[in-house]
C-alpha cells in the first residue's frame, strides 16, 4: 500500500514515522458450540464477506455436531441487502426474504432458493438490531422457521440512495421501504419478538 508520514511530539521531542496503509479486515461473523448439539453464530454486520464467513462457520458447527442454531443479531446495525439474502439462503426454505416498495407503487422482492430442511433455530434481537438484521429476523418469523427472542428491534426499514451534489458533497435520501415476506412494514415499527426478554 501507500505510505503516510506522521510526526508525533512527545515530551518536547518530535518523532518521525513512515506508516504503510493497508486494508483492515474486521470479522463480521463469530461462532462457537453452545452445547452438545447447539451452534451459536453472532453476526456483527452484513458486509462483503459476511455470507462466505457464515457459510464456513455454519459448516464447521455442523461438523462439530450442531443440530440447532442460535443466530445472534443483537447490536447489528445492518448492512448490504445481498449479504443478508445470501445468509438467509443458507438457513431458510425457498421463497421471498424481503421486498421493497416505493411511494409510486413500484416493488421488488428478493427471493432465495433456500434449503429443504432448515435446522431448528432461534434469532436473538434487541433495540439496536436494525436494517438487514431486521430483514433476517422478519423472514425467519414470517416463514415460521425459527423463534425470535429478545426486545423489539430498531425499526430501520428504508432503502437509501446517494446522489452526487457536486463539490465533494452528496445527498442521501430514502427512496423505498422494506417489508417482511408477509408484507409487514419494518420502518419505525421493528420486529416484535415471539418471546420477549429484556436485556
Predicted regions and their residues:
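Short, acidic, Ser/Thr-enriched surface-loop or helix-capping motifs
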Residues: 180
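Short acidic, Pro/Gly- and aromatic-enriched capping/linker segments at domain boundaries
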Residues: 165-177
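Cleft-lining beta-strand/loop regions that shape enzyme active-site pockets
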Residues: 1-156, 160-166
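Short hydrophobic-aromatic micro-motifs
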Residues: 41, 171-173, 186
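Conserved helicase C-terminal RecA-like lobe
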Residues: 188-199
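Generic structural signal for well-ordered beta-strand positions
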Residues: 15, 186-187
Amino acid at each position: 500500500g501507500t505510505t503516510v508520514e506522521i510526526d508525533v511530539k512527545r515530551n518536547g521531542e518530535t518523532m518521525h514515522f513512515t506508516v504503510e496503509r493497508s486494508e483492515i479486515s474486521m470479522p463480521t461473523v463469530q461462532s462457537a458450540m453452545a452445547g452438545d448439539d447447539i451452534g451459536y453464530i453472532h453476526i456483527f454486520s452484513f458486509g462483503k464477506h459476511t455470507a462466505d464467513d457464515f457459510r464456513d462457520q455454519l459448516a464447521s458447527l455442523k461438523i462439530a455436531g450442531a443440530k440447532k442454531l442460535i443466530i445472534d443479531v443483537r447490536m447489528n446495525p445492518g448492512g448490504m441487502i445481498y449479504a443478508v439474502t445470501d445468509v438467509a439462503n443458507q438457513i431458510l426454505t425457498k421463497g421471498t426474504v424481503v421486498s421493497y416498495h416505493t411511494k409510486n407503487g413500484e416493488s421488488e422482492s428478493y427471493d432465495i432458493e433456500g434449503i429443504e430442511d432448515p435446522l431448528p433455530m432461534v434469532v436473538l434481537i434487541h433495540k439496536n438490531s436494525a436494517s438487514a438484521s431486521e430483514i433476517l429476523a422478519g423472514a425467519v418469523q414470517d416463514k415460521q422457521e425459527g423463534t425470535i427472542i429478545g426486545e423489539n428491534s430498531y425499526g430501520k426499514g428504508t432503502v437509501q440512495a446517494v446522489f452526487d451534489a457536486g463539490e465533494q458533497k452528496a445527498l442521501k435520501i430514502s427512496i423505498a421501504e422494506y417489508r417482511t415476506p408477509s408484507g409487514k412494514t419494518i420502518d419505525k415499527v421493528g420486529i416484535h419478538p415471539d418471546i420477549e426478554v429484556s436485556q
